[in-house]
Amino acid sequence: MNISNNAGIDSNDLAKRGESLIRKSTNRYLTTVRIAFRAKQRRFDDFDGLLEESTIKPVQRSIIELSDEQDQPDLLPG
């Protein structure tokens, strides 16, 4: 089953990113909470109209963002 075929997100890639987040974490529970918290923030941003890209579900977007932050820390500001 493809999670979001119409949005252009590969479900296999999303699953690998999620597994990578869990595997590289020291605490699986805190990683899950971070994903959920980020998804909740994105959901409210969608309601407020702050994000243009609403075809991706908030949980999917948060997994992608956290995975990118983990794999490419040099992209973070500061």
Curated annotation (Swiss-Prot):
EC number(s) per entry: 2.7.7.6
A Pfam match: RNA_pol_Rpb6
Keywords: DNA-directed RNA polymerase, Nucleotidyltransferase, Transcription, Transferase
Presence of the UniProt keyword Oxidoreductase in the record: no
One function term, GO molecular function aspect: DNA-directed RNA polymerase activity
Catalytic activity as recorded in UniProt: RNA(n) + a ribonucleoside 5'-triphosphate = RNA(n+1) + diphosphate
InterPro entries: DNA-dir_RNA_pol_omega (IPR003716), Pol_omega/Rpo6/RPB6 (IPR006110)
Domain of life: Bacteria
A Gene Ontology biological process term: DNA-templated transcription
GO cellular component, as recorded: DNA-directed RNA polymerase complex
HAMAP family registered for this protein in UniProt: RNApol_bact_RpoZ
Subunit structure: In cyanobacteria the RNAP catalytic core is composed of 2 alpha, 1 beta, 1 beta', 1 gamma and 1 omega subunit. When a sigma factor is associated with the core the holoenzyme is formed, which can initiate transcription.
Function: Promotes RNA polymerase assembly. Latches the N- and C-terminal regions of the beta' subunit thereby facilitating its interaction with the beta and alpha subunits.
Entry similarity comment: Belongs to the RNA polymerase subunit omega family.
Protein name per UniProt: DNA-directed RNA polymerase subunit omega
Protein species of origin: Prochlorococcus marinus (strain MIT 9301)
Annotated gene: rpoZ
